[in-house]
UniProtKB/Swiss-Prot annotation:
Residues 125-154 are annotated as: Disordered. The gene is Rnf138. This is E3 ubiquitin-protein ligase RNF138. GO terms for cellular component: glutamatergic synapse; postsynapse; presynapse; site of double-strand break. Interacts with NLK. Interacts with XRCC5/Ku80. Interacts with RBBP8/CtIP. It comes from Rattus norvegicus.
Length: 209
């Protein structure tokens, strides 16, 4: 792949990955001041979270950029010409087709459990403690409820956002902070924050039954 790049560009393979979701860029956009590139959806989500700063370097971003970021057309064109290796099966794929490949790559599915998503809602330790209370409630009210257990006999849990399973409580927290930090999740405004999280966790338990 380096030979393909060196022929007409100074880009490296890392330049084709979004620094927010850590996946191959999808509809790449570029900041005017610092020239950093992100997936369009990742950038707009980060703007709603952080306001006026670049998600990578905290540089300034104009109001116009926050609403309508400039597409990195030059990078899109290069991604259509240059191939990279799938991170799981090592198959050579054009970068602009890489995310589509992930959806059918069995090794990718086995490794990550779900095709690439943008990632995310940050889950705090307080939320995890809330989930502990919901576990007790679920076990009291559901006669057929049974926790999954790992080979070591400890209970395991399924991520309520991407459905990946076999997490301990701490690994579930780490997974959500790593993979779902900026994911937008539909919110029922009639429920308070703790009730929303408890509902998601209880649904996860029911899937594991």
């Amino acid at each position: 792949m380096s030979e393909e790049l060196s022929a007409d560009t100074s880009y490296t393979e890392d330049d084709f990955y979004c620094p927010v979701c850590q996946e191959v860029l999808k509809t790449p956009v570029r900041t005017a001041a610092c020239q950093h590139v992100f997936c369009r959806k990742c950038f707009l989500t980060a703007m709603r979270e952080s306001g006026i700063h670049c998600p990578l370097c905290r540089g300034s971003v104009t109001r116009r950029e926050r609403a309508c970021p400039e597409r990195a057309i030059d990078l899109e064109n290069i991604m259509r010409r240059v191939s990279g290796s799938c991170r799981c099966c090592s198959k050579k794929i054009k970068f602009y087709r890489m995310r589509h490949h992930y959806k059918s790559c069995k090794k990718y599915q086995d490794e990550y459990g779900v095709s690439s998503v943008i990632p995310n809602v940050k889950i705090s330790q307080d939320s995890v403690r809330s989930s502990n209370r919901s576990e007790t409630s679920a076990s009291d009210n559901t006669e057929t409820y049974q926790e999954d257990t790992s080979s070591s006999g400890h209970p395991t849990f399924k991520c309520p956002l991407c459905q990946e399973s076999n997490f301990t409580r701490q690994r579930l927290l780490d997974h959500c902070n790593s993979n779902h930090l900026f994911q937008i999740v539909p919110v029922n405004l009639q429920l308070d924050e703790e009730t929303q999280y408890q509902t998601a966790v209880e649904e996860s338990f029911q899937v594991n039954m």
